[in-house]
Every structure is written in structure tokens, then in C-alpha cells.
């Protein structure tokens, strides 16, 4: 059985609903959470997450997102990762940002090229926070080897299932599966995201990777209300 990760946008649709969603994920034994910190130019996000980011930034700021993250961390017992953009980390100062977010397992920087990971590595290692590497269907063999080398026991490799932004349809072609297998063959956990939206997609991921990440669909269901979100998580986890 693979691991399941759910992406939630910090304080969206509101702080109250965000925290209620965290409680649902805890109740249904979701393995890990990605908590997104909204950014004004979210280049990796599709229409749903882009709109959600803009709406959230009208009402909340980084201080709010960090406060929401810490409240979530008190509730959720699994691993918690922050997903954000390089400008937020740079502008805060890497050490200051890591100190402020506190006790988390790792950070995913959506627009950080693999070749620039080294710029952050020292500070992350000093604080025992994983800097999650991305791989894509276009990743070269040397990229895969670099990602494997940099991964640590509290982290994973985030394999983007398709070209483009979050959301959309899910598929894994043979070339992508081959690259996932190459990374897994070195003993590193590989989690697949982008376009994963239902139980069928999750089961497809579990056949070739160590875990699945659901983002856009989870946020869309939460927009409908906490009951719709709970039903969605119940279905995805196979809990009835």
C-alpha cells in the first residue's frame, strides 16, 4: 500500500475550514500533508490553485500562513511539508524562514530548478529539514541521479506526472514509469503528483510509485464545504 499525501492551501477557503480539513486528514489517517503558502505568481499552479492563491492573499499574509501551519501541526500527527515559491524563501532569508515555520519535515519549492538546490542545501541540512527535489517526464539520467543523491530519510522525490501545471487529466506513459523505476531502484521514495484526482488514479500511482499526492481536487472539494471534503477523503482512503 502506498502513502497518500493531501495538499491544502494555507488558510483557504478560510482559517476555520483549513483547520477543519486538517482534522479530517488526521481522522482518516492521511500519511502526510503539503501545506501551500500562496504566492502572487504561482507558475506551477493550474487555474483552481492560482485563483485560490489570489483570493487568499487578499485576506492573509505570510505571518497568518505560518500561524495556520503551526496550528495544523498540533493536530496532524504525520509528516507535514510546506510547498511554496523561491521568492518567499529568499525574501524572508533562508534561515529566518526555516526558523519561523518551525517543526516540519521538509519544504517543496515549486519553481526551484534542480541545479539551484545547492544554494539552499546547507541551511536546510543544519536544521534537519528536507529540501524536496522535483523530477519530471523530461528529467535526464543525471538529474535523476542528482535527486537521488540529495534525498534523505525524511524526504522523498516529487515526480511530476505530466508537463504543465497542476490539475488537468492524469496519465503515466511508459517513459515516465521507467524514470520512476530508476529512482525507486536506488531505495528512495518517489511520490507522484499533478493530475491525481480520484481513487482510480491513486491506485494507478501505487502500482508504480511509493505514494500519491492530491492537490487541485482536494482544494476543489474543500471549496464545496467540509462535508464534501470529508466524503472525498473517505473515498480516497477507502475508509467506507
For the regions a language model picked out, list residue spans one by one.
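Short beta-strand/loop segments at the ligand-binding rim of alpha/beta enzyme cores
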Residues: 2-5, 75-85, 124-136, 183-195
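Catalytic cores of alpha/beta
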Residues: 15-26, 139-152, 192, 196-212
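Active-site-adjacent beta->alpha loops and helix N-cap segments on the catalytic face
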Residues: 39-51, 57-70, 89-94, 109-126, ...
Amino acid at each position: 500500500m502506498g502513502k497518500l499525501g493531501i495538499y491544502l492551501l494555507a488558510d483557504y477557503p478560510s482559517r476555520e475550514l483549513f483547520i477543519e480539513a486538517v482534522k479530517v486528514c488526521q481522522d482518516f489517517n492521511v500519511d502526510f500533508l503539503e501545506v501551500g503558502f500562496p504566492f502572487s505568481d504561482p507558475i506551477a499552479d493550474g487555474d483552481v490553485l492560482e485563483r485560490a492563491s489570489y483570493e487568499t492573499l487578499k485576506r492573509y499574509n505570510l505571518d497568518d500562513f505560518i500561524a495556520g501551519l503551526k496550528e495544523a501541526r498540533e493536530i496532524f500527527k504525520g509528516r507535514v511539508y510546506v510547498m511554496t515559491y523561491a521568492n518567499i524563501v529568499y525574501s524572508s532569508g533562508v534561515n529566518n524562514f526555516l526558523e519561523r515555520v518551525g517543526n516540519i519535515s521538509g519544504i517543496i519549492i515549486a519553481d526551484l530548478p534542480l541545479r539551484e538546490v545547492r544554494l539552499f542545501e546547507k541551511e536546510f541540512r543544519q536544521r534537519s529539514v528536507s529540501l524536496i527535489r522535483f523530477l519530471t517526464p523530461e528529467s535526464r539520467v543525471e538529474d535523476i541521479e542528482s535527486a537521488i543523491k540529495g534525498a534523505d530519510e525524511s524526504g522523498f522525490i516529487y515526480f511530476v506526472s505530466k508537463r504543465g501545471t497542476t490539475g488537468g487529466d492524469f496519465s503515466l506513459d511508459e517513459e515516465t514509469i521507467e524514470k520512476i523505476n530508476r529512482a525507486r531502484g536506488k531505495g528512495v521514495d518517489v511520490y507522484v503528483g499533478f493530475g491525481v484526482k480520484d481513487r482510480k488514479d491513486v491506485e494507478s500511482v501505487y502500482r508504480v510509485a511509493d505514494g500519491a499526492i492530491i492537490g487541485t481536487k482536494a482544494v476543489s472539494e474543500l471549496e464545496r464545504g467540509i462535508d464534501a471534503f470529508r466524503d472525498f477523503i473517505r473515498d480516497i482512503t477507502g475508509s467506507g
